[in-house]
Curated annotation (Swiss-Prot):
GO terms for molecular function: urocanate hydratase activity. It is found in: Cytoplasm. The gene is hutU. Pathway: Amino-acid degradation; L-histidine degradation into L-glutamate; N-formimidoyl-L-glutamate from L-histidine: step 2/3. It is an enzyme of class 4 (lyase). NAD(+) binds at residues 54-55, 132, 178-180, 198, 203, 244-245, 265-269, 275-276, 324, 494. Binds 1 NAD(+) per subunit. Its cofactor is NAD(+). This is Urocanate hydratase. Keywords: Cytoplasm, Histidine metabolism, Lyase, NAD. Belongs to the urocanase family. The lineage of its organism: Bacteria, Pseudomonadati, Pseudomonadota, Gammaproteobacteria, Enterobacterales. Its main location: cytoplasm.
Amino acid sequence: MTAQNSKFRSVGIRAPRGTQLTAKSWLTEAPLRMLMNNLDPEVAENSYELVVYGGIGRAARNWECYDKIIETLKELEDDETLLIQSGKPVGVFKTHSNAPRVLIANSNLVPHWATWEHFNELDAKGLAMYGQMTAGSWIYIGSQGIVQGTYETFVEAGRQHYNGNLQGRWVLTAGLGGMGGAQPLAATLAGACSLNIECQQSRIDFRLRTGYVDEQAKDLDDALTRIEKYTQEGKAISIALCGNAAEILPELVRRGVRPDLVTDQTSAHDPLNGYLPKNWSWEEYRQRAISAPEEVIKAAKSSMVEHVKAMLIFQQQGIPVFDYGNNIRQMAYEVGVENAFDFPGFVPTYIRPLFCRGIGPFRWVALSGDPQDIYKTDAKVKELLPDDQHLHHWLDMARERISFQGLPARICWVGLGQRAKLGLAFNEMVRSGELSAPIVIGRDHLDSGSVASPNRETESMCDGSDAVSDWPLLNALLNTASGATWVSLHHGGGVGMGFSQHAGMVIVCDGTDEAAERIARVLHNDPATGVMRHADAGYEIAIHCAKEQGLDLPMLNTK
């Protein structure tokens, strides 16, 4: 079986449910179930090719590697650690019971060679795998994983631009993949209508089926008629439109249409695999990506130019426009749009104050498969954080509107101090039997202290340290030392090869005293690195938070 052919398998994968173990302990059962859950057809964008989300973000290098990972996890002891190199299981080593059970490194290249061209050569030879962020680190939970972050972004945009009220307003965006698919629901929850352009009908069908988008328009005229009707009625309805953003946005400009917010979440970070050139069919795009990759990349970037130029015109008209972290500005800049960065990224514009307090995407998954376990943890979050009415509102909306994909899961943005409190409480719920099986807690790599990405999470840092990637390396090392159950270190997630480095962690709450000790360390230290990183850069909010939380930052005399 060749490296390429072993990427394809027509099979449905579903993680085990219940309390029956297939591995030797919950510490190894958890990564096994979460890897399988990443590839559940309810979760993954293209499970047959091991693609979870984000263009070609995969969970394992090929099907042979997947099989061997599962086989190895089933036999792994609680004092051993499995090493994963770009989706391939390469070694098992004796460590100790408080060490991670799995250590993962995905897509990492020496900086000079950190380009899509070199990566694609390696990938074609079966020597590399693009892990995106949570695809190759086995903690993807479907579009819910980004819904609250997108919701928080839209809410903050409404606060800054429309006096905190998006009723009667509408968002223009594109991309309904694993990440972009969160946009329509997030806009609805924030009170706005949205027009969501997507070039693949299958993705629109997926979002309609899972309740992330409300309706599909038959063409642009129909979409605009619906937008006008719903905004006049003050209804927050999301509309999908099958088409190409590089064609539709310029047409909207020509017609003089004025959205209230404009952004984009196409997979522009990967022009070879993630952005359809205008006037091409998807089938033609995929065929020519194999036969004429340089031609495809050129055509995709040329279309991105049209897309970005339209976004710039909207901005010049006074409409709030922002990059949602897919590196489309960079792609357009590289082929001649010198002012591509005139519109800002979402992190410095709307999210950074949260990062300064270690607040970010805290997520957990019920390994039992029982939705009641999630509903019980929702109630526990409200009990332990009684004064955070914004968070309570989010949890209520999530329960009402968000469909679980695969194993039941929840996301909520909480910060330093809160994460450890919640994790320890969940562990006690497992110990007491209130929850029917262990919980895993993880996060997106998009977090306060775990990523260096100058065109996204670390854009426009106040001290100019945007590209310093020591921070995610330190985050991964500290989470390993603290006893996370698995730790990952990736390159290129979100924005593509050469533009980011980032780390992830997952910890198991199995109800034991040993788990409680690990949880206390990991869920304090992990967000604390974000406060440290921002305090070191000079953000006063972060410095104050560090002092308030008793962090020992020697150069800042915080203790």
